[in-house]
Curated annotation (Swiss-Prot):
Catalysed reaction, written as an equation: alpha-D-glucosamine 1-phosphate = D-glucosamine 6-phosphate
Annotated InterPro entries: A-D-PHexomutase_a/b/a-I, A-D-PHexomutase_a/b/a-I/II/III, A-D-PHexomutase_a/b/a-II, A-D-PHexomutase_a/b/a-III, A-D-PHexomutase_C, A-D-PHexomutase_C_sf, A-D-PHexomutase_CS, Alpha-D-phosphohexomutase_SF
Organism listed in the record: Streptococcus pyogenes serotype M3 (strain ATCC BAA-595 / MGAS315)
Function statement: Catalyzes the conversion of glucosamine-6-phosphate to glucosamine-1-phosphate.
Co-factor binding details: Binds 1 Mg(2+) ion per subunit.
Active site per database record: 101
UniProt family annotation: Belongs to the phosphohexose mutase family.
Domain of life: Bacteria
Protein name, as recorded: Phosphoglucosamine mutase
Length: 451
């Protein structure tokens, strides 16, 4: 069976890998799988980001949904978490987002949400993939009144914006610099922060279909850092292309990453008795300084594999309400079921406003250790078995002994490529270089492809 779904839906170069033909099939088969047990006409929300390929894929996807009798509500440009929110609150059968998140404009993606607002379970993805791989399409082909209908639904954006504002507090007297990545947040972030009475300055707000994430947004915060310093803003907020992640900038122009954002919000919730099980869910990539700050604060942590879907799975299974990743995916389950950059930004500003502390003061409680990551090309068959190689296991153990608890080593296989990732954290850059380079040399000698 072909593997179409990755960790965040189906992705590829638009019109080359992710074609209109595939989008049509995903609409048809995905719509069928997600609505086959509905007793009334299914209702599905569809949104996209600002990529030039978005309307092409949107049209094809919607045609597929209509072909199996689904009532489609077209949201236009909207943040990914907005789809998740509307699916839950408007009691839809499913939602679909057309976006490749932080990827460049030539890529695009299609991801589905079930009627609970969560991304699809593995068995649902497998069912869709089985239909994609079937020798022929045997699904029903309704006609006349059995066909689906299309409803333009611009009010979905207004409802999502109103929801975001209700989670915040009055930001009068605060200046906020926004970078909307020329993406989905460009239609909402300005209005939301104005409604919260903040003074704002905005960049990355002029999408042309080709400039999404291009030198702007959460993966390129340099322009925002300059804007914060130029305007004297209290904080800067950078979203990615579909606004499901956030990277912040403090008033001095320094980056505040997902680890620090989670700590700031988590500490605030913990002190109010609102942090479920007094626990934050994070991944193996979170910085050692983040872990030490949690320990000092008496906050527990649950650690998952890399990927926001694994964070969400742990949150759902154990009843936690805050989790996320260093990259800026932060899930606040009290409000939404997926990472939401604008929601997280509002909560961060709320903590600043209610504590009266600057972002640099709040972030200073987490001392970020220098971190280095090296990717080493290995045979696919060996990447999962690297730790079985005695020389590799021995050098890792030796380096960990030298660290004496004041550092961290993580060696893990890539989920999608024939790579072994070697990461280390330590108090100084020189120590990090030493640990990573020493381990990487042994890995290359033992199982590297270049040998």
């Amino acid at each position: 069976m072909g593997k179409y779904f990755g960790t965040d839906g189906v992705r590829g170069e638009a019109n080359v890998e992710l074609t209109p033909e595939l989008a049509f099939q995903l609409g048809r088969f995905g719509g069928y799988v997600l609505s086959q047990h509905e007793t009334e006409r299914p209702k599905v929300f569809v949104a996209r980001d600002t990529r030039i390929s978005g309307e092409m894929l949107e049209s094809a996807l919607i045609a597929g949904l209509l072909s199996v009798g689904i009532e489609v509500y077209k949201l236009g440009v909207l943040a990914t978490p907005g789809v998740s929110y509307l699916v839950r609150t408007e009691k839809a059968s499913a939602g679909v987002m057309i976006s490749a998140s932080h990827n460049p404009a030539l890529d695009n993606g299609i991801k589905f949400f079930g009627n609970d607002g969560f991304k699809l379970a593995d068995d649902q993805e497998l069912e869709i993939e089985a239909l994609l791989d079937a020798p022929e399409d045997t699904l029903p082909r309704p006609s006349a009144e059995g066909l689906g209908t299309l409803v333009d639904y611009p009010e979905g954006l207004r409802k999502y914006e109103k929801f975001l504002v209700t989670t915040g507090t009055d930001l009068s007297g605060m200046t906020v610099a926004l970078d909307t990545a020329n993406g989905a947040a460009s239609v909402s972030a300005r209005d939301v922060f104005l409604d919260l009475n903040a003074e704002i300055a905005v960049i990355g707000e002029k999408p042309n279909g080709l400039n999404i994430n291009d030198g702007v947004g959460s993966t390129h915060p340099e322009q925002l850092q300059e804007l914060v310093k130029e305007t004297g803003a209290d904080l800067g907020l950078a979203f990615d292309g579909d606004s499901d992640r956030l990277i912040a900038v403090d008033e001095t122009g320094e980056i505040v990453d997902g680890d620090r954002i989670m700590f700031i919000i988590g500490k605030y919730l913990s002190e109010k008795g609102l942090l479920a099980h007094n626990t934050i869910v994070t991944t193996v990539m979170s910085n050692l300084g983040f872990h030490k700050a949690l320990d000092k604060q008496g906050i527990n942590k649950a650690i998952t594999a890399v990927g926001d879907r694994y964070v969400v799975e742990e949150m759902r299974s154990s009843g936690y309400n805050l989790g996320g990743e260093q990259s800026g995916h932060v899930i606040i389950m009290d409000y939404n079921t997926t990472g939401d950059g604008q929601l997280t930004a509002i909560q961060l500003a709320k903590v600043m406003k209610e504590t009266g502390k600057s972002l640099s003061e709040l972030a200073a409680e987490v001392t970020i250790y220098p971190q280095k990551l090296v990717n080493i090309r290995v045979e696919n068959s060996m990447k999962e078995r690297a730790m079985e190689v005695p020389a590799i296991a021995n050098i890792i153990a030796k380096m960990e002994d030298e660290m004496a608890g004041n550092g961290r080593i993580l060696v893990r296989p890539s989920g999608t490529e024939p790579l072994l990732r070697v990461m280390a954290e330590a108090p100084t850059d020189a120590e990090v270089d030493y640990y990573v380079d020493t381990i990487a040399d042994v890995v290359r000698t033992e199982i590297g492809c270049d040998n």
